């Protein structure tokens, strides 16, 4: 081998580093954070993350430009689609009650580099999302005062004509972010109390809108004379669904907060289900009364609800709507500031991000450094940048996280379950017994070997029909089927999204491609379903695996393909920056990297029964104990 060139063994070792998994610890209730959040706290955090400015702006935009009164169907379909992703988060959040959300879920099932990239994108999602909401909050308040704040700033500082920068510095948006960061740094209890207050006001205002809206409803506004219920047809409903889907992306704050929940195994799935139901009900009912109060084609997209009440002679109701809108945006702001430092804390605690962000304040028991640093960064973005061009960039990071979490659910279900971290030795008997361990290099012989089927093996009832799969080692056929499932989902999504006109295929070619992609997708799904899964856990589990996460993967892929190419270019650039951070810092400081040298020198332990209560433990060296270092290979 030429000097200086890495050997095959070194390359394999490098790939193992990239794909190493974080051990899935079932007993993970111990934490340096304070477990003080109840189911109600988590539910209101989720509602606050989902029911924000979208209710007051998005509803009117989709109704007027995309779906008409059928906007309620768009919200319904979007809620069902979000439910698929929410179920995946619920299972992981209950089973792994640690902070980190999609980052942690990917780390324990798919590998380190994938987890870092997901965490890196979620970080940007919260950073830009919080800044965008702060600017929307500032703009809404400025509009109430007839844009006097903007006029004052422009008259004293002038108008900026620099690309990517705002036309004027938004000091109000930056100020509200700094104030909110100060409150969030006081502890989870203070953040929860603020969120309770704003969420309660927001829900009361929503209830007021629904009740008064139904009183003022005119069924004639859905008649054929006004364009009918679905003036844009089925395609308009689907286009509205793609937009409405982003109204439900805030539920992951619940999973990110699971390490501070009192009873996460029960509270996390319950809070996700309740908050998603409340948010879906609010969006569907508000969109219904909005299009019943006034004709859909006369709506003002910028302030649809306030304008609708004004048209019906209830201008005073516009003030109540404004109060509800401000409170709703406050809850979204708190949700972003609450979640972002905890994602960074999880990455720093694992060694993949700078260690300073893993520090927890001894009194408030929150990652105060991350809160203040990223609160200031968020304030700078809101102060200086024009965020309109970056808003769509948020969706791709969210959808990618949803896709990886759904894939991780399939991986986890077909993996062999990890045993307890401190297994009790069984009483000695006449035969050797075997214990599994987190490490591949440690084996305790002490539990009787059985021939029971393991996760990843073909179901016994199907062996006569699928015998060619029975020869595969456990998990091999599952891994191939999952890879083919994801590839076929991308192919099928391309066919469905771009259509015959964009692909420039003859009709028969388009139909053939659709049939082949669909058949491969279904076949890989059936192969996955033909294998054993883990036994039912004590915590919440998704029904119909692998069907439910597979549908989530397909849907998320379709929505990602509908994004513009500029969004994809920005996304690729951000990924490249993340790879520089990972290879420059994360891969060398990873806690799993520090664990590996110990694992390489760990002996195998065999328990020999002695016929008494005492057992003799002897160290048995592996067959190839000392790894040979090859030239050009550096650890």
From Swiss-Prot:
Gene3D superfamilies registered for this protein in UniProt: Amino acid/polyamine transporter I
Transmembrane regions listed in the UniProt entry: 42-62, 66-86, 113-133, 197-217, 229-249, 270-290, 318-338, 365-385, 391-411, 478-498, 508-528, 539-559, 567-587
Record flagged with keyword NADP: no
Topology in the lipid bilayer: Multi-pass membrane protein
Keyword terms: Amino-acid transport, Glycoprotein, Membrane, Phosphoprotein, Transmembrane, Transmembrane helix, Transport
InterPro entries found in the cross-reference section: AA/rel_permease1, CAT_C
GO molecular function annotation: amino acid transmembrane transporter activity; carboxylic acid transmembrane transporter activity
GO cellular component, one term: membrane
Pfam families: AA_permease_2, AA_permease_C
Annotated compartments: Membrane
Highest taxon, organism lineage: Eukaryota
Glycosylation-annotated residues: 146, 151, 195, 221
PTM-bearing positions, type Phosphoserine: 422, 427
Major site of localization recorded for this protein: membrane
Function summary: Involved in the transport of the cationic amino acids (arginine, lysine and ornithine).
Family that this chain belongs to: Belongs to the amino acid-polyamine-organocation (APC) superfamily. Cationic amino acid transporter (CAT) (TC 2.A.3.3) family.
Family annotation (PANTHER family): CATIONIC AMINO ACID TRANSPORTER 4 (PTHR43243:SF4), INNER MEMBRANE TRANSPORTER YGJI-RELATED (PTHR43243)
Protein name: Cationic amino acid transporter 4
Name of the encoding gene: Slc7a4
């Amino acid at each position: 081998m030429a000097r200086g060139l890495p050997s095959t063994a070194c390359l394999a070792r490098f790939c193992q580093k990239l794909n190493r998994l974080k051990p899935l610890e079932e007993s993970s209730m111990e934490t340096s954070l304070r477990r003080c959040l109840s189911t109600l706290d988590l539910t209101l955090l989720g509602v606050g993350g989902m029911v924000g400015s979208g209710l007051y702006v998005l509803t009117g935009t989709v109704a007027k430009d995309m779906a008409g009164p059928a906007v309620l169907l768009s919200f319904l379909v979007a809620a069902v689609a979000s439910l698929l992703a929410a179920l995946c988060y619920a299972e992981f959040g209950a089973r792994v009650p640690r902070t980190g959300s999609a980052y942690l879920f990917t780390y324990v099932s798919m590998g380190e580099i994938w987890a870092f990239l997901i965490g890196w994108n979620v970080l940007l999602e919260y950073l830009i999302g919080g800044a965008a909401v702060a600017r929307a909050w500032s703009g809404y308040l400025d509009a109430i005062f007839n844009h006097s704040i903007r006029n004052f700033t422009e008259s004293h500082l002038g108008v900026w004509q620099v690309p990517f920068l705002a036309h004027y510095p938004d000091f109000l948006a930056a100020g509200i972010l700094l104030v909110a960061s100060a409150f969030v740094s006081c502890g989870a209890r203070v953040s929860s109390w603020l969120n309770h207050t704003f969420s309660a006001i927001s829900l009361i205002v929503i209830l007021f809108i629904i009740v008064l809206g139904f009183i003022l409803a005119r069924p004639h506004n859905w008649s054929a004379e006004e364009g009918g219920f679905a003036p844009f047809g089925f395609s308009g409903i689907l286009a509205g669904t793609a937009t409405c889907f982003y109204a439900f992306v805030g539920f992951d704050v619940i999973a990110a907060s699971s390490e501070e929940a009192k009873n996460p195994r029960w509270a996390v799935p319950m809070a996700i289900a309740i908050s998603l139901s409340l948010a879906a009900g609010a969006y569907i009912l508000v969109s219904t009364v909005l299009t019943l109060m006034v004709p859909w084609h006369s709506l003002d997209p910028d302030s649809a609800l306030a304008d609708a009440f004004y048209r019906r002679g209830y201008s005073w109701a516009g003030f109540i709507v404004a109060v509800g809108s401000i409170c709703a945006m406050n809850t979204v702001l708190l949700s972003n500031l609450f979640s972002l430092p905890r994602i960074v804390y999880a990455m720093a605690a694992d060694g993949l991000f700078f260690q300073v962000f893993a520090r927890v304040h001894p009194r408030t028991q929150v990652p105060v450094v991350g809160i203040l640093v990223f609160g200031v960064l968020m304030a700078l973005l809101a102060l200086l940048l024009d965020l309109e061009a970056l808003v769509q960039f948020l969706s791709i990071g969210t959808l990618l996280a949803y896709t990886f979490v759904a894939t991780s659910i399939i991986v986890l279900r077909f993996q062999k379950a990890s045993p307890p971290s401190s297994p009790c030795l069984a009483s000695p008997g006449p035969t050797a017994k075997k214990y599994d361990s987190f490490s591949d290099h440690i084996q305790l012989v002490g539990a009787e070997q059985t021939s029971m089927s393991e996760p990843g093996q073909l179901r016994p009832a199907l062996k006569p029909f699928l015998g060619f799969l029975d020869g595969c080692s456990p998990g091999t056929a599952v891994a191939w089927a999952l890879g083919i499932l994801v590839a076929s989902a991308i192919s099928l999504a391309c066919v469905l999204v771009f259509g015959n006109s964009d692909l420039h295929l003859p009709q028969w070619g388009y139909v053939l491609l659709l049939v082949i992609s669909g058949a491969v997708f279904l076949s890989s799904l059936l192969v996955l379903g033909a294998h054993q899964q883990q036994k039912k856990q004590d915590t919440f589990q998704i029904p119909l695996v692998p069907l439910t996460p597979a549908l989530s993967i397909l849907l998320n892929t379709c929505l990602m393909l509908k994004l513009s190419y500029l969004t994809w270019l920005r996304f690729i650039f951000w990924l490249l920056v993340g790879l520089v951070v990972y290879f420059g810092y994360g891969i060398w400081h990873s806690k799993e990297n520090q664990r590996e040298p110990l694992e390489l020198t760990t002996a195998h332990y065999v328990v020999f029964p002695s016929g008494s209560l005492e057992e003799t433990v002897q160290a048995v060296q592996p067959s190839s104990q000392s790894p040979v270092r090859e030239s050009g290979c550096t650890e």
